[in-house]
């Protein structure tokens, strides 16, 4: 059966049932749950240290009212980080390459930050649409520009995550295909492409981590504007 490069981005099905939900729940099963023991193992210690580091980075720009979002934002970045990294394994499906899933995460969370600002401080939230000192003739145009910029924020969040991961997966598949195809004909060139593939894989690991961090960091900055 002939497969295209984009078949890796289609959700697998078992008996007609999409397996995207189990693939989202699998990373949570791989994380060790803290026990009641006095001494934790090394993996639990590293996980706790990493969670505290992420929470500190995300909560630093927020005031005390925004700290109630700590559990949601920390859980979100851990989920995205786990899914992105597991998606780099061979023959695995990466749910975060689906724009529908990323938009399903970005749109409600962005809307929650916006509604929080409109409920708690409506004047300050609407004031972001018109910077202070704007000349009177530019007020209508600037309000339209700022409103458009506000409304495309969830789209930018979802498209950024989808595009970066999809491009990385396609590059890895293209270079790995070229490495296998060149191996019997030009072994030296195949070795060079294999080295490029190794470096690209390291880069994609960094991209997977950075994109998860950027997604949640931008949400925390949007929350900072509305608290």
From Swiss-Prot:
Cellular localisation: Mitochondrion inner membrane
Entry's Gene Ontology molecular function annotations: proton channel activity; proton-transporting ATP synthase activity, rotational mechanism
GO annotation, biological process: proton motive force-driven ATP synthesis; proton motive force-driven mitochondrial ATP synthesis; proton transmembrane transport
Listed CDD domains: ATP-synt_Fo_a_6
InterPro entries: ATP_synth_F0_asu, ATP_synth_F0_asu_AS, ATP_synth_F0_asu_bact/mt, F0_ATP_A_sf
Pfam families noted in UniProt: ATP-synt_A
Listed transmembrane segments: 12-32, 69-89, 98-118, 139-159, 170-190, 196-216
Membrane topology of this protein: Multi-pass membrane protein
Swiss-Prot/TrEMBL keywords: ATP synthesis, CF(0), Hydrogen ion transport, Ion transport, Membrane, Mitochondrion, Mitochondrion inner membrane, Transmembrane, Transmembrane helix, Transport
Catalytic activity: H(+)(in) = H(+)(out)
GO cellular-component term (any): proton-transporting ATP synthase complex
SUPFAM superfamilies assigned to the protein according to its UniProt record, in alphabetical order: F1F0 ATP synthase subunit A
Quaternary structure note: Component of the ATP synthase complex composed at least of ATP5F1A/subunit alpha, ATP5F1B/subunit beta, ATP5MC1/subunit c (homooctomer), MT-ATP6/subunit a, MT-ATP8/subunit 8, ATP5ME/subunit e, ATP5MF/subunit f, ATP5MG/subunit g, ATP5MK/subunit k, ATP5MJ/subunit j, ATP5F1C/subunit gamma, ATP5F1D/subunit delta, ATP5F1E/subunit epsilon, ATP5PF/subunit F6, ATP5PB/subunit b, ATP5PD/subunit d, ATP5PO/subunit OSCP.
Membership in a protein family: Belongs to the ATPase A chain family.
Name of the featured protein: ATP synthase F(0) complex subunit a
Provenance organism: Gallus gallus
């Amino acid at each position: 059966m002939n497969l295209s490069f984009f078949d890796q981005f289609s959700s697998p099905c078992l008996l007609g049932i999409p397996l995207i939900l189990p693939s989202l729940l699998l990373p949570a099963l791989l994380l060790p749950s803290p026990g009641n023991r006095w001494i934790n193992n090394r993996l639990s210690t590293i996980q706790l240290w990493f969670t505290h580091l992420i929470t500190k980075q995300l909560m630093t720009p927020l005031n005390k009212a925004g700290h109630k979002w700590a559990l949601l934002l920390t859980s979100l970045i851990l989920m995205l980080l786990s899914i992105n990294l597991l998606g780099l394994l061979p023959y695995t499906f990466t749910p975060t390459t689906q724009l529908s899933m990323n938009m399903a995460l970005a749109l409600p969370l962005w809307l929650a930050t916006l509604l929080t600002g409109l409920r708690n401080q409506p004047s300050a939230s609407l004031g972001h649409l018109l910077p202070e000192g704007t000349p009177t003739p530019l007020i209508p145009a600037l309000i339209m520009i700022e409103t458009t910029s506000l409304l495309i924020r969830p789209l930018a969040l979802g498209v950024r995550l989808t595009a970066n991961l999809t491009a990385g997966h396609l590059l890895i598949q293209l270079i790995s295909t070229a490495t296998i195809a060149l191996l019997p004909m030009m072994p030296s060139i195949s070795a060079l492409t294999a080295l490029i593939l190794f470096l690209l894989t390291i880069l994609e690991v960094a991209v997977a981590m950075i994109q998860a961090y950027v997604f949640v960091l931008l949400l925390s900055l949007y929350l900072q504007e509305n608290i």
